[in-house]
Amino acid sequence: GHYHLATVDNQRISKEFTRNMRTGIERTYEKAVENPFLHGIPYIWCSNNLTTAMLTQCRLYRETTGDETYAEMEAALRDWLFGCNPWGTSMIVELPLYGDYPSQPHSSLLNAGVGNTTGGLVDGPVYRSIFESLRGVNMTGIPGTPGQDYERFQPDLMVYHDAIHDYSTNEPTMDGTACLTYYLS
């Protein structure tokens, strides 16, 4: 809504909602500059959904104002989803083909052996404290294939796993996938 209100003819309304967009982006940017991946998103459930939301917000702000201040963060957020992250893996199921991507998402399709959620954006990393408090999560992979725990690459602060039984970091989400589709279209 802020994007549309920022483009109305009424200058008072337009300025107010442009300021609202910039303020939200700036708060994320202030955290991002402390991260080597320029990623200032909190690592809560569905952190990749938040990443795509901020990615889209940066683009809409840039298109509305012509202000390139946050273009580098926008690129870093996009790149995070495609593998420029501590694990070096894409967060999109089966993309890039023959690359490192979520191959064992928490999905009933995969569990039943009838296919995969190709193109789905997975939840993304969560704070280690969240992951360690969960029940029923394990690194068991699909039969015959162990899950990928990325143990060598796990930062102290957060975790991500490519294992079918990790519903906290590796479950594809429709809303995150839709947001990413919007950005990429």
Model-based region annotation:
Residues 1-33, 41-185:
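Aromatic (Trp/Tyr) and acidic
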